């Protein structure tokens, strides 16, 4: 039976090699069973440009390339940590970059997919930050800085993000349900798949909509399998 896999929020980094091992294991054992793989953002804990080179980046690039060379399509939606992943990296591994919101047809079902950070509209500080860093001129400027400078900036942003989270309520960092319903009506879908919040679950709200939240990767992987039989985490 044909199936499609969805993953998100792996937050791969040199500091957590066990996550890379989990990813490699998934890519070599489970991923080849699918016809398509969707990565819904934050594959990397941070990304400072396609010109950066490291053992981690090479490993991920090779794993995705091996998958796409087998004829399995791989798609990527940017997360809040790796929104600077560019066409150079994507092309090097045969991966297709998708926009912030994308409608896909999954075995007869019309589904909206996204990373999920745009759904957290109650987090006003983050939404203001996102609006700034999504400006093309600012991204161009950042990507033309020396790698060492970019790395320092990324580390400062990451540390600030950790600090900010300790002062924010859980409710603020979760999706705004009214906005979720609004965006689903806008795209005329009743099924949504997203990540970002790390709260793996399948929310059934008949007859209105189904919202599937991908989990983050930690001690184990979080993989959503979609087939003609429906949705399940494996």
Curated annotation (Swiss-Prot):
Its main location: membrane. Keywords: Cell inner membrane, Cell membrane, Hydrolase, Lipid A biosynthesis, Lipid biosynthesis, Lipid metabolism, Manganese, Membrane, Metal-binding. CDD domains: MPP_YbbF-LpxH (cd07398). Mn(2+) 1 binds at residues 9, 11, 42, 198. Its EC number is 3.6.1.54. GO terms for cellular component: cytoplasm; extrinsic component of plasma membrane. SUPFAM superfamilies: Metallo-dependent phosphatases. Its cofactor is Mn(2+). It is an enzyme of class 3 (hydrolase). It comes from the Bacteria. Mn(2+) 2 binds at residues 42, 80, 115, 196. Belongs to the LpxH family. PANTHER family: UDP-2,3-DIACYLGLUCOSAMINE HYDROLASE (PTHR34990:SF1), UDP-2,3-DIACYLGLUCOSAMINE HYDROLASE-RELATED (PTHR34990). This is UDP-2,3-diacylglucosamine hydrolase.
